[in-house]
Amino acid sequence: MKRINRCSKSLYHHNYVTSSYGGKTRIRCMKTFRKELWFNVPSRRGFINITPQIEECLRESGIREGLILVNAMHITASVFINDDESGLHQDFEVWLEKLAPHAPVAQYRHNVGEDNADAHLKRQVMGREVVVAVTDGKLDFGTWEQIFYGEFDGRRKKRVLVKMIGE
């Protein structure tokens, strides 16, 4: 495939490519889409189901087949896929606190001038981003899968990047 043109408008970029199938050449349009979502969790930690916002971005993009990358743009926040079940979220809280307890804050070398070393570790465990396939204009999830924003050092605005590529 060979790119022959590139133009951009608003949040969208269109890459036109040529491809040959059985001696015929056709031009296809590959779109990209970018949007930032902002969150301000009022507590130190929390989980937000952001699937509806991601689905809205997908509708906005017009992409029917492709991939979506969703990533936290802060080092004490996470984006992950799991079930939207409150008991599971409580289990995450307990498990993460056992792995990287907030207190005593003096146990961490990072805590010089701040007390969020545990939040960095929790983010590392839960992950930075997810990639989801788009099929027929929909997120191609398994049973019960949803996309979550995980906050581990809240009480301020943080961004999540949504980036899509497809046609």
Go through each PLM region and give its residues.
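Intrinsic-disorder-associated, low-complexity terminal segments enriched in Asp/Asn/His/Tyr and depleted
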Residues: 5, 12-15
